[in-house]
């Protein structure tokens, strides 16, 4: 049993090190983005269960979308490394962009589940949705 626990710990350390090597430091934008990605997927699954629209294809599309967000983030990291100025400029901008998108989706999912959303957040959502629908 102790050997299994050690293997799990080593796996977690390996994944954390790999993630840090790929995406850079675990600063607040990265941590926030990862938390928002998880919360968006979780609230989406809960919403799908409640509306009885949950299926594996929709779940796979959601996981794929989340994975592609990390691909875009990796492109930004590589651009920052190419510039070699010691700052995470592109990575931080991309993280903020997806934090906003994931945050909006979390609020929409919560609203669909009947959670009251403060009016100022509702108005912000409406404005952002209107801007996104204009092509």
UniProtKB/Swiss-Prot annotation:
It is found in: Cell membrane. InterPro entries: Phage_holin_4_1. Pfam families: Phage_holin_4_1. Keywords: Cell membrane, Membrane, Transmembrane, Transmembrane helix. GO terms for cellular component: plasma membrane. It comes from the Bacteria. The keyword Oxidoreductase does not apply. The keyword Zinc does not apply. It is a multi-pass membrane protein. The chain crosses the membrane at residues 4-24, 26-46, 68-88, 93-113. Belongs to the bacteriophage holin family. Cp-1 holin subfamily. NCBIfam families: holin_tox_secr (TIGR01593). This is Uncharacterized protein CPE0383. It comes from Clostridium perfringens (strain 13 / Type A).
């Amino acid at each position: 049993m102790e050997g299994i626990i050690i293997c799990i710990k080593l796996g977690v350390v390996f994944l954390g090190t790999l993630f840090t090597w790929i995406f850079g430091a675990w600063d607040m934008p990265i941590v926030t983005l990862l938390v928002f990605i998880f919360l968006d997927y979780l609230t989406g699954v809960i919403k799908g269960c409640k509306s009885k629209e949950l299926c594996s294809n929709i779940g796979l599309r959601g996981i794929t979308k989340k994975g592609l967000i990390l691909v875009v983030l990796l492109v930004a990291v590589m651009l920052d490394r190419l510039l070699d100025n010691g700052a995470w400029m592109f990575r931080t901008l991309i993280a903020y962009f997806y934090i906003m998108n994931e945050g909006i989706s979390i609020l929409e999912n919560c609203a669909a589940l009947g959670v009251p959303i403060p009016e100022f957040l509702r108005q912000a959502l409406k404005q952002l949705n209107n801007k996104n629908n204009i092509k």
